[in-house]
């Protein structure tokens, strides 16, 4: 299920747009995740009190965490599938400390695609969307495999 060089290029081209403003992209991704799947908010103690989209938009903590999430994901995407070193600590914390189910990784992947479609329609056509979905699926599958190694059935 690997990506071709051309597919990785499509992924990294649009990711360059994300990196130009990681905090606002991260904020939008988390808001999209929480709006589409309110149950995911329960995994974030510091955001549980944010009930409305306006409250979420006003939260500097949410923006900061969104930037952290997308910075980590960007580091993984740039490895073009050779992301074992980057993935291991992420899987460890998400499986043992945060207990984030694999399903939630699917939800945030969908939120990322949604935000990219909205913010960068000219740079995120069908081919780029397909490549990004494949890259995010590769990430999720590898996270799930690590979860299994760690004995987490998320």
Curated annotation (Swiss-Prot):
Pfam families: Globin
Sequence positions bearing Phosphoserine: 4
Reactions catalysed, as given in the entry: Fe(III)-heme b-[protein] + nitric oxide + H2O = Fe(II)-heme b-[protein] + nitrite + 2 H(+); H2O2 + AH2 = A + 2 H2O
GO cellular-component term (any): extracellular exosome
Binding-site positions, nitrite: 65
Annotated positions binding O2: 65
Binding-site positions, heme b: 94
Quaternary organization: Monomeric.
Functional description taken from the UniProt entry: Monomeric heme protein which primary function is to store oxygen and facilitate its diffusion within muscle tissues. Reversibly binds oxygen through a pentacoordinated heme iron and enables its timely and efficient release as needed during periods of heightened demand. Depending on the oxidative conditions of tissues and cells, and in addition to its ability to bind oxygen, it also has a nitrite reductase activity whereby it regulates the production of bioactive nitric oxide.
Identification of the protein by name: Myoglobin
Organism: Sapajus apella (Brown-capped capuchin)
């Amino acid at each position: 299920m690997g990506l071709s060089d051309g597919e990785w290029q499509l992924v990294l081209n649009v990711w360059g747009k994300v990196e130009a403003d990681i905090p606002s992209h991260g904020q939008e991704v988390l808001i999209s995740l929480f709006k589409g799947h309110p149950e995911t908010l329960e995994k974030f103690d510091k955001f549980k009190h944010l009930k409305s989209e306006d409250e979420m938009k006003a939260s500097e903590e949410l923006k900061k965490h969104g930037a952290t999430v997308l910075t980590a994901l960007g580091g993984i995407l740039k490895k073009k599938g050779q992301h074992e070193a980057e993935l291991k600590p992420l899987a460890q914390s998400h499986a043992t400390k945060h207990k984030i189910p694999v399903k939630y990784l699917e939800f945030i992947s969908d939120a990322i695609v949604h935000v990219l479609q909205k913010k960068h329609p000219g740079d995120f056509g069908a081919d780029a969307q397909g490549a990004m979905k494949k890259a995010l699926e590769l990430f999720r599958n590898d996270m799930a495999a690590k979860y299994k190694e760690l004995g987490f059935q998320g």
